[in-house]
């Protein structure tokens, strides 16, 4: 492996030189940071190491071409000390004074066990030479290691092959310097293997950037005729680190497929773009795993997201029969339904542009290029149009007699019956059968609403980071979910953000803040959330590398239009050889919709709820050809089918639960759906 070593005029660069040479088997090529970047033969190198040095990364004299190496080379980069600080600063972090100067001083470094720290004990001893430190890392940079004084000692970019260490691994006083260099070598080689895999794939991804950003609903109406199967994964609320992109597409491409699966049959049914249907008897997750491997296409380096086309759809709750549950109830809808998308439009709400993605077989790209050209012209035309004002939701709602939970709407369990089931949950908890039971109720009503206008109303009422509109032949799914089930990177990084704990928004700023503070501090809500955090940690620990699962954020309050929510974040890294489908299978259904212990609690739920949940409380999103995935929990979601609307509501029952409060919480959670359907707030259930 050939390595370029950029010397920031440091006195330890050739100590790094030796460690790099030992790890790679070849001496690196050393160039000073004031070399001519344009004359460097980057095609001759496999990786770059940016050395320590004096000064600050924001000064040209101190950092020079190190900046270009990080931002422009496209190669795996390891930044050491000053190089580490440069990565942080170039992606929006802050570099300022460290708590105290640390020159030639030894610290213990604690780490996650990932990437450059793979296989190393935590803590280990390292030597530090720095007065500055990286702080306030942006979400695209992930800290991997820390010293006891709280300074970030290691980081990585979530999408690019960039790593940094603040300490000096080459120092004679540092432990495991050679191992860190060997780990970087392995990461660089793995990156290049993934790129070479693209040449082996039977498919080729074509990408075009269009520097306009039309209104998302205008794109849905103007680019997708609405026939067949369509999807709109909608970041109607753009939150840093959670939602930046929306994706739209349909089944008109030459490689598109629409597949459904029902647990009772055990058969995957696939309708191709030519109208023919094939049926395969195979467990769903096994089928999905095989197809993703067969069709694997590495992430395009010029895309700022990991969705490079693939499967878009939902996993219904009753699919639990193929993970950790029993086939107690049969859903009227497919237990899984996905569109294999070979064309998609991505809206970048942060940069104000679009990306067009088209997949074709190698050597047969005329259709893809024509679609890119035509769609770019359509988007440019849509960008000059003023988006229409959303039509009030009540125009499309259920008949007036069914307003709220009126006489034409039917809850599976009325208030008295639901309260009795809460009491049953409390008895099961008192008897030691469960710690937490996520009890839910299903509500149905006749409706004349159609999917797109109704979803337009729902997204206006409740903008969220994980919204979605799936218009499939059997049903339409309209989701205003605020909850991330799992996001899985092509590099194996995993994140889950379960929600447990809800309060309504207040009528005044003072009341709103009081409700928010009550949610943040109430023991009952924290207990609910904590138990699900531990459950999700357990699920991820079954498929993640030892020591990689951690909780960077615990009990954070997130605020949305209708409610405040208590959210925690769990992260990990998949064990080598573990597929994306295997990770989802290990965690499905999401613990925030079951309770704990999961298997026994789902048995209790099956008995008390007396019917299927269907799409509700499953998962919705995409599995990409890159090996990445992003799935939300299906909550705050309306399902339209056969002239009826249905949605689920519920809450976690714990020993501290109050029955009336739990019922009221279901009413609060229903507000967005009911308001979209009939234009009025929920007054109560009958």
UniProtKB/Swiss-Prot annotation:
Residues 2-194 form the Glutamine amidotransferase type-1 domain. The active site is at residues 81, 168, 170. It holds the Pfam family Chorismate_bind. It catalyses: chorismate + L-glutamine = 4-amino-4-deoxychorismate + L-glutamate. Residues 233-686 are annotated as: PABB component. Disruption phenotype: Disruption of the gene decreases sulfanilamide resistance and blocks chloramphenicol production. InterPro entries: ADC_synth_comp_1 (IPR005802), ADC_synthase (IPR005801), Anth_synth_I-like (IPR019999), Anth_synth_I_N (IPR006805), Chorismate_C (IPR015890), Class_I_gatase-like (IPR029062), GATASE (IPR017926), TrpG/PapA_dom (IPR006221). Its EC number is 2.6.1.85. This is Aminodeoxychorismate synthase. The lineage of its organism: Bacteria, Bacillati, Actinomycetota, Actinomycetes, Kitasatosporales. The gene is cmlB.
């Amino acid at each position: 492996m050939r390595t370029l070593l950029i010397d920031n005029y440091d006195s330890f660069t050739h100590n790094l030189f030796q460690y790099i040479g030992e790890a790679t088997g070849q001496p690196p090529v050393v160039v000073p940071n004031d070399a001519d970047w344009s004359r460097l033969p980057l095609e001759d190198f496999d990786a770059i190491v940016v050395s320590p040095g004096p000064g600050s990364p924001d000064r040209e004299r101190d950092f020079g071409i190190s900046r270009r190496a990080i931002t422009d080379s496209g190669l795996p980069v390891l930044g050491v000390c000053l190089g580490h600080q440069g990565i942080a600063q170039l992606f929006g972090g802050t570099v300022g004074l460290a708590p105290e100067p640390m020159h030639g001083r030894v610290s213990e470094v604690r780490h996650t066990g990932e990437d450059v720290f793979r296989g190393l004990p935590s803590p280990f001893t390292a030597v530090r030479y720095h007065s500055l430190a990286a702080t306030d890392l942006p979400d695209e940079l992930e800290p991997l290691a820390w010293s006891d004084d709280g300074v970030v000692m290691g980081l990585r970019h979530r999408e690019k092959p960039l790593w940094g260490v603040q300490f000096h691994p080459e120092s004679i006083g540092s432990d495991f310097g050679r191992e860190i260099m060997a780990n970087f070598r392995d990461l660089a080689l793995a990156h290049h293997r993934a790129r070479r895999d693209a040449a082996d794939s039977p498919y080729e991804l074509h990408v075009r950037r269009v520097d306009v950003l039309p209104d998302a609903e205008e794109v849905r109406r103007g680019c997708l005729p609405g026939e067949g199967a369509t999807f709109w994964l909608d970041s109607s609320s753009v939150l840093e680190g959670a939602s930046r992109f929306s994706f739209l597409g349909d089944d008109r491409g030459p490689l598109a497929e629409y597949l459904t699966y029902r647990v009772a049959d055990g058969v995957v049914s696939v309708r191709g773009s030519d109208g023919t249907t094939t049926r395969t008897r195979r467990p769903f997750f096994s089928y999905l795993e095989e197809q993703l491997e067969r069709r694997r296409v590495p992430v395009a380096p010029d895309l700022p997201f990991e969705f490079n086309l693939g499967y878009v759809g939902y996993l219904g709750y009753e699919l639990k029969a193929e993970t950790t549950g029993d086939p107690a109830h049969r859903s009227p809808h497919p237990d899984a339904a996905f569109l294999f998308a070979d064309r998609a439009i991505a809206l970048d709400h942060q940069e104000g542009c679009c990306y067009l993605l088209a997949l074709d077989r190698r050597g047969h790209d005329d259709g893809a290029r024509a679609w890119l050209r035509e769609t770019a012209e359509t988007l440019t035309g849509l960008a000059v149009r003023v988006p229409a004002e959303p039509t009030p939701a009540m125009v499309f709602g259920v008949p007036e007699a069914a307003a709220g939970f009126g006489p034409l709407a039917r809850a599976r369990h009325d208030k008295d019956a639901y309260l009795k089931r809460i009491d049953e949950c409390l008895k099961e908890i008192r008897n030691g059968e469960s710690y937490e039971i996520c009890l839910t109720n299903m509500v149905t009503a006749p409706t004349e609403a159609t999917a797109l206008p109704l979803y337009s109303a729902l997204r206006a009422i409740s903008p969220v980071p994980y919204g979605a509109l799936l218009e499939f032949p059997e049903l339409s799914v309209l989701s205003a979910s605020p909850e991330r089930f799992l996001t899985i990177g092509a590099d194996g990084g995993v994140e889950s953000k379960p929600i447990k704990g809800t309060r309504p928004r207040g009528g005044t700023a003072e009341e709103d803040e009081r409700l928010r503070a009550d949610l943040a501090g109430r023991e009952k809500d924290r207990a609910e959330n904590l138990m699900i955090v531990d459950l999700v940690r357990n699920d991820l620990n079954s498929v993640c590398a030892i020591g990689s699962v951690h909780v960077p954020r615990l009990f954070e309050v997130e605020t949305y239009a209708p409610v405040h929510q208590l959210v925690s974040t769990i992260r990990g890294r998949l064990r080598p050889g573990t597929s994306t489908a295997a990770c989802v299978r290990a965690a499905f259904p999401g613990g925030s919709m079951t309770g704990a212990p999961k298997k026994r609690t789902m048995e209790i739920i099956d008995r008390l709820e007396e019917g299927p949940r269907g799409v509700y409380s499953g998962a919705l999103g995409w599995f990409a050809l890159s090996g990445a995935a992003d799935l939300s929990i299906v909550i705050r979601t309306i399902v339209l089918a056969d002239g009826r609307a249905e949605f689920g509501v519920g809450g976690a029952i714990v020993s501290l639960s109050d029955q009336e409060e739990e019922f009221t919480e279901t009413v609060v959670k229903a507000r967005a759906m009911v308001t979209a359907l009939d234009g009025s707030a929920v007054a109560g259930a009958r």
